[in-house]
Amino acid sequence: MSPKISLKAARVNAGLTLLNASAHLKIGKDLLLKWEKNPGLVNPIWQKKISAVYNLPVDFIFFGQ
């Protein structure tokens, strides 16, 4: 199993602020912050959307599994 980076680290590495990322994902910043604090809450559909916005494969981001 390869090492994974946190959801927040993935966002920062993509050069996005919390507000920028939430705008790209069309969700509220509070929801994104909640997911960053508890990535196990992110369902597979949103995992794919986040990985596309952050330009990282889903397998590289830690989603709590």
Model regions: which residues?
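Short basic helix-loop element that most often maps to the first helix and adjoining turn
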Residues: 5-24, 49
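Conserved short acidic donor-positioning loop in nucleotide-sugar-dependent glycosyltransferases
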Residues: 64
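A detector for short, charged/polar N-terminal pre-domain segments
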Residues: 1-2
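Conserved hydrophobic/aromatic packing and binding residues within compact polymer-binding modules
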Residues: 7, 21-22, 32-35, 61
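DNA major-groove recognition helix of helix-turn-helix/homeodomain DNA-binding modules
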Residues: 26, 45-60
